[in-house]
C-alpha cells in the first residue's frame, strides 16, 4: 500500500541552533579561505596593475557600476536634496530669490573657473582632492540603454527654467558680462507673469527623466530627432531652475508636517517638475524658499554642500535685498524676453510620457520623509564628553534601530576618501560587535549605568577607529567591490565575492558636512543655518538617515523610508529617547548639564525675516574664500 508506512515515519527534528550557526560560520570561513587560496592573488594583481596606470584604482568603477550602469529611476534612488535656511527666508518674492541665488551660483562658477576657490584642508594641513568640483556646472547625465554617460561642457551662458509645465531658456550674460541679480529677477518675473499655457504633454515631459534609465534612453532618441533644439537647451544649460507654484518650508501652524512636506518636495517633487538628469536643479518655491536637488553620479555631498553654503551666504549677506524684498539695482528693459522652448512631440512619445508620469507618481507617493531638529543637546555637549560626535550618533542609531526592529542590521555609513587623488567614498560598517554589546546592555535591566557607559565608550572608540581606517584607504568595501569587478571581467565565479555583493544595507546613513567655508559667523547669526539634506533608502525595507549638527546645540535628522514596507514605521517617528539615553549616563554628563535653554530658535517656531537688516545686506560681508576660509570638513558625505 502506498501510504502504509506513513504513521511509522519519524518527524523531522529541529537542529541545534548552535550547530547550525557553527556550520554556517564554518562554511563562510571556508569560502573566504578558498577565495584567498584560489582567486584573491590574481584579482589583487590586476588591481595593483590598475593602480599603477589609473589615477584611482576604484573611483571610476564606482561611478560606472554603482551609478551609470544602474537602470533604476534617479528620483529617490540616487538623487539627494539640500535645504535652505531653516528659520529665515530673506525675501518672500520668488523671482527676487531666484535672481540672487542664480547670480550667486554663477559667481561661484566664475571663481571655480578662475581657480580662486582654495583647496579644502583636513585639520588645516592635509589637502583634499578637488577633482569632483570640475563637473558641478554645465553637466548632464545622458541616459543609455545599458549605461549612462556624463556630458560636461566647458561653458554655458544660460539656465533652463521650468514653470507651470513650460520650459524656458534664460540667458545669464549680456555682452560677455554676468547679468545683475535685478536683471535676472526681471527675467524670472517675466516667466512667472507669462500667461501662455503648456502644450499637450509638455507639462509632464520631465517625468521621463524619472523613468528607468533604459526606458528614458529609448524615448530620448525620438525626442532628440523631433525636438533637438529644446532638448539641447535643457541638457546644455549651466543648471536647471524650477519655479514651483506652491510654498514650502517650516510653518508655525504645523512645523513637523511642513518640514516633512518640504523634504518630500525636494526629493521627489511631483515627479514631472524636475529635470533629474542635470547635475543639480535649483528649486524656488512660491514663498521664496529655496532647495537643491542633486544628481549623485558626478560628485558627493561635500562638493555640492560647499557650493550651497557659498550660495546661501552670498545671496543673503553679500548681495542682499532692498526694503521691498527685490534684488538690489535696476531692471534692464533692453533684455530680450526669455525664450520659450517648443517641443515637437511625436504621438509615440505621448504614451511613454503618460507611463513615466504614472510610475513617477507611484514612486513619489511611496516615499516617506521625516525631518526633525533634536534640541536636547548637540555637538558641544558631545565634545565635552570627549567623544567623537559622529561616532556618538552612529552608536545611538544602532540603539534606535534595535528598539524599532528588535534586531541588528547591516549598516552603511559613507565617509570620504578625498585624501587620495580622485578619491570618493568608503563604507564604515557601523553595526560593530562593540555597538551590539552596548545596545544589549542598554536593554538589560540588570546592567548598571557604569557598565553601559563603559560599553558605550568602547563602541564609540571602535567606530572612530573604523572611520579613520576608511578615510586613510584601509576600508573594506571599496576594495571588495573592486575585486568583484575584476572577477566579472575575468569571468571568475567567487562564492565569497557573490555573497558580499548581495548584501543589503537596511540602514544607510551619512553625516551632512557643515561650515566647510566661513562666509559669516553662525554664532552671531544663529537663525541663518540650514538643516542639511537627505536621500532615499537603499533597501525597500530599510531607512535612509542623514544628520547634521546645526550649530552647537541642535542635531537635525532626515529619515526616509518606503510606505509600502510594513517594517519601517517607528524609526521615522523616533522621538528623543534613544538619542538622549547615552547622554543621560552619569559619567557622560558629569560636571555639566545638557542645555536647559532652548536652541537659538525653537524648531517649532519659524521666524520669517524677509526684510531683516541681514537680508538687506547690512550683515557681515563674506570674505569670499580668504586663507582662513578652509576649515576642517566634516568626515562624512553622502
Give residue spans per PLM region:
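Long, Pro/Ser/Thr-rich low-complexity/intrinsically disordered regulatory tracts in eukaryotic proteins
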Residues: 1-278, 287-288, 295-613, 619-638
